[in-house]
């Protein structure tokens, strides 16, 4: 058995050596802690001081006017300045101190003239230039990013701010059902082969679950562990009716119907996913009257029908902050009063480091446009409770997602020639960076996955029946304990 985290004098930090994950050789902290409260205070205080220069209106009118006018510029200035001036969260760890040229080859002369030697390149400029072929990396992408603090600067750039102002903010404000369908179609209908080349045969685009940290379980094992866990938490029985909202390629729907003989319905906006899932159900010998994949918005389901069990795995991020409460209320209305909801959602930590912010903006631009509802756990819980749900259990699966992403990363590299032949170098590079950076971000807490088990907050709900499925309270001691008398 491998040991727990041990101190490595070469990097000045504790490191792990667990077979289940891609272990961090240099688990160093980044610069700054992003605080929404601090930003809000600055945005609110600046117009207060400026009111003295607008003497022709009442204080309230002047303040509101200045708040509207200065809010966005102040936010931009805050991000630009703080990302450059903030210190590392903890000043520990030993960087290699190598030159930029040891990590990459900069092919663009103008870029090379500005960034060389010990001059760190902004991370956004690096990945954009890499996608465009202006930069080639030396060695493995994941290895390169493990030492990113030695060669990259995690600062907000004008290009990032332009994206925030012209794309991200309008998406958050005007997020619509039509936008969801367009973005889902663009991403998930790119080609089943594209997704299979990293997702593998299970075709599950959500986090798997580790069961043994000292064993490198296959991607299929991680996903099978997750399917079993979700169905256990749902307490599936033959008489159940299951709804999978955002069912992907139908693997969970098929698994539930095949193993628990329940009636399972999956909904997706993707044409490719619906066709693939329908075929998967048939290929597994499940009768069409017991399982089906519908290509439709779940809000278009028959409002009079209720489901005894509902599951949604990493779909809610795409709903958008503006429509989140409405989405959860719709889910509430679809669930029977004694039903169970398993709600798995990707999220972030409440106090970001600036590298988390820059990674999040990359993800929104290149991988999951419109997925603006990846929020902190406390925010998600608050929204669920406001919708009328009560939490039974929460599991934080960030490191499990890192393990899953690492398997996806390995698959993507294995299928490089196929990707290049059909989709080209740029798409290969974008996904290589996405997968490698996400392995790290999920492992170190910048992003995570929350698996939440819920039911309606009603007096008549029989909470005692949930105890057998509450996995985290059932333990097997490593040795027989000596009891206190």
Where are these regions (language model features)?
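Conserved SAM-binding loop of SAM-dependent methyltransferases across substrates and taxa
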Residues: 249-260
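A short acidic, Gly/Pro-enriched loop at the edge of an enzyme's catalytic core
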Residues: 299-310
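A short glycine-rich, Lys/Arg-flanked "PGG" loop and its adjoining helix->strand segment in the class I
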Residues: 325-337
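Conserved class I S-adenosyl-L-methionine
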Residues: 238-248
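Conserved beta-strand signature within the Rossmann-like core of class I S-adenosyl-L-methionine
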Residues: 338-346
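Feature captures hydrophobic
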Residues: 2-223, 229, 260
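Substrate-binding/catalytic lobe of Class I Rossmann-like enzymes that use SAM or dcSAM, i.e.
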Residues: 346-462, 468-472, 476
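Conserved SAM-binding strand-loop segment of SAM-dependent methyltransferases
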Residues: 285-298
């Amino acid at each position: 058995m491998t040991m727990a985290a041990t101190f490595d004098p070469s990097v000045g930090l504790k490191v792990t050596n667990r077979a289940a994950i891609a272990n961090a050789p240099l688990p160093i902290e980044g610069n700054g802690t992003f605080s929404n409260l601090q930003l809000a205070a600055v945005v609110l205080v600046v117009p207060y001081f400026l009111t003295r220069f607008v003497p022709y209106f009442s204080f309230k009118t002047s303040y509101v006017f200045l708040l509207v006018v200065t809010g966005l510029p102040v936010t931009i200035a805050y991000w630009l300045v703080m990302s450059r001036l903030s210190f590392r969260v903890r000043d520990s760890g030993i960087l290699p101190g190598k030159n930029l040229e040891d990590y990459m080859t900069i092919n663009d002369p103008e870029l090379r003239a500005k960034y060389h030697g010990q001059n760190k390149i902004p991370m956004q400029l690096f990945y954009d230039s890499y996608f465009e072929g202006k930069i080639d990396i030396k060695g493995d992408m994941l290895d390169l990013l493990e030492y990113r603090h030695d060669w990259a600067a995690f600062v907000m750039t004008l290009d990032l701010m332009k994206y925030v102002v012209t794309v991200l903010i309008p998406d958050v404000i005007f997020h619509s059902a039509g936008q969801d369908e367009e973005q889902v179609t663009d991403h998930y209908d790119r080609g089943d082969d594209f997704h299979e080349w990293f997702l593998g045969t299970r075709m599950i685009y959500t986090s798997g679950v580790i069961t043994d940290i000292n064993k490198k379980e296959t991607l299929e094992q991680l996903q099978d562990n997750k399917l079993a866990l979700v169905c256990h938490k749902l307490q599936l029985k033959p008489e159940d009716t299951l709804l999978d909202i955002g069912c992907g390629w139908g693997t969970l729907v098929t698994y539930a119907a095949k193993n628990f003989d329940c009636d399972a319905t999956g909904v997706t906006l993707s044409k490719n996913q619906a066709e693939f899932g329908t075929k998967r159900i048939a290929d597994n010998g499940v009768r069409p009257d017991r399982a089906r994949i519908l290509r439709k918005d779940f809000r278009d389901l028959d409002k009079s029908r209720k489901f005894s069990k509902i599951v949604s795995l990493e779909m809610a991020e795409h709903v958008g902050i503006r429509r989140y409460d409405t989405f959860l209320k719709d889910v509430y209305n679809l669930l029977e009063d004694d039903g169970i909801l398993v709600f798995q959602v990707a999220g972030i930590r409440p106090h970001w480091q600036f590298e988390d912010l820059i990674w999040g903006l990359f993800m929104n631009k290149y991988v999951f446009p419109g997925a603006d509802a990846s929020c902190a756990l406390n925010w998600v819980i608050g929204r669920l409770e406001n919708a009328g749900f009560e939490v039974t259990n929460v599991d934080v699966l960030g490191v499990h997602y890192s393990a899953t992403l690492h398997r996806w990363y390995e698959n993507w590299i294995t299928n490089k020639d196929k990707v290049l032949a059909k989709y080209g170098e740029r798409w290969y590079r974008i996904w290589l960076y996405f997968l490698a950076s996400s392995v790290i971000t999920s492992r170190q807490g910048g992003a995570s996955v929350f698996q939440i088990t819920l039911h309606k907050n009603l007096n008549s709900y029989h909470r005692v029946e949930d105890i057998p499925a509450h996995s985290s309270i059932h333990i097997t001691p490593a040795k027989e304990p000596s009891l206190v008398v």
